[in-house]
Regions:
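Repeat-mediated protein-protein interaction surfaces in helical alpha-solenoids
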Residues: 2-6
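Aromatic-lined substrate-binding rim segments of carbohydrate-active enzymes
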Residues: 9, 35-116, 138-142, 146
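Hydrophobic faces of well-ordered beta-strands that scaffold small-molecule active sites
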Residues: 18-22, 49-51, 85-89, 152-156
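A short, mixed-charge helix-start or loop-turn motif at secondary-structure junctions
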Residues: 20, 56-60, 119-124
Length: 186
């Protein structure tokens, strides 16, 4: 079944419904509980969930290894139950292997020390290395799920500036200077 995403008319036969749900992190639980999760969602009237917000490490457990199997299964399970998927970019938290290989993706505090990895948005938004890896991830997600009828929205991110609102790295300084040049012409 193909659904056209038209906010706020979503998911109902008469076009009068709105999205009702929240974040769902199935990758943090045993697959054996997913059926109960979906049943309880249906019982609560949930018709949309945001999935994969913190899942980059599960989707790409190693630099050259991708695992979409679990995501395929949960999207299919949700969709067949009539619950639409708002698929996240999964960039809210980068995998630890990325920080280990490229510590320069971490933001820096005002003393030049890297901010610890492992929390939401522990990456520098101006890091070209982070952007390259994040873009690869987003392309893979779009290629795989771009035509999936159960994916009705793309969750690009929220709560910006959580752990990276202050970044004193050279990349941040250069990005700010470029912004000033473009805005003020000097």
């Amino acid at each position: 079944m193909h659904r056209t995403f038209k906010w706020p008319e979503l998911l109902t036969d008469n076009g009068k419904g709105i999205a009702y749900g929240g974040d769902y992190n199935p990758d943090q639980w045993s697959e054996s509980v997913w059926d109960d999760d979906v049943r309880l969602m249906k019982q609560a009237g949930v018709n949309t969930v945001a999935v994969a917000i913190f899942s980059w490490d599960r989707i790409q457990p190693e630099e050259n290894r991708w695992d979409f199997g679990w995501l395929d299964r949960i999207i299919d399970k949700l969709g067949k139950a009539g619950i639409a998927v708002d698929l996240a970019s999964a960039t809210a938290t980068a995998p630890l292997w990325l920080y280990e290989k490229h510590p320069e993706v971490l933001p820096q505090d005002k003393f030049g020390h890297p901010v610890n990895a492992g929390s939401r948005q522990s990456w520098s938004p101006t890091s070209p290395v982070f952007k390259e890896y994040a873009l690869t991830l987003c392309r893979k997600l779009a290629e795989r799920y771009g035509t999936n009828p159960y994916v009705t929205a793309w969750h690009m991110g929220n709560e910006y500036g959580w752990n990276n609102r202050y970044d004193y790295s050279d990349n941040a300084l250069n990005a700010f200077r470029l912004w000033c040049e473009r805005k003020y012409g000097t």
